[in-house]
Amino acid sequence: DDIDVFMMRDDYNKMLKIAPNYFKEPYFFQSAYTDVMVWGFSKLRDSRTTAIEFDDMKEQFNQGIFIDIFPLDSTDDGSAKMKTVTNIKKDIWDCIFNREAILNNIDNPDIWKIFTLDKDMILELVNMSYKDALRVFEEFCETHLYDTDKLRCWSSEVMGRLRKHYERKWFDKIEYAQFENILVPVPADYEEVLTMEYIEWKIPVKSETLHSGIIIDPDISYKEWLKSHTKYKKNVME
């Protein structure tokens, strides 16, 4: 129901620096550094279209139809080193997304037992801005990208989808495949990637989409939709 693009973490971090100035209207590169939402991935949007996920957000928050862009990182391969690296990633992530729970339990000695990082580092991270703490996370991930050949998207890690992982060799070579009227780069070992992702990917499945709740309209801008929807809600309430 949408397009997901995966990039190695080092390429992804480069993109974060380049993309905001590279993409011009009507396209908009959206990340934690361009908007109020804090995500561990990015979106490339078409501002002429509508893909409303949050109908209570103001027009300044771009909600055009999007491509999701996810970084691939090294992950736990069973070794002691990668277990530690993965646990530190989780610690930093908690300091970004669960900081209120940490700060509310700051005097509870048991909370410090769950972290691999020491208390001083945790407190330093939770007192950073969300964006600065996210930069720490992204830089740490890039530093350890080549520590193992086992890769995983961090969003899968967070959601507990641990069955899914990728071998680095699957991405060693790329080839170009036809997608509608364009050619897109895909891993030469795309069958291995698809099997890991979907198991029986050659069998069509009719099911609800992940983004079934999104309001999609390719013909009008999300700004127009929000304006008309806001007026509608106001009239109903009156």
What are these regions (language model features)?
Residues 1-16, 181:
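Catalytic metal-binding acidic patch
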Residues 88:
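Short, His- and charge-rich active-site/binding loops that engage polyanionic ligands
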Residues 78-84:
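A short secondary-structure junction signal
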Residues 19-77, 97-197, 204-238:
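Conserved catalytic core of two-metal-ion nucleotidyltransferases
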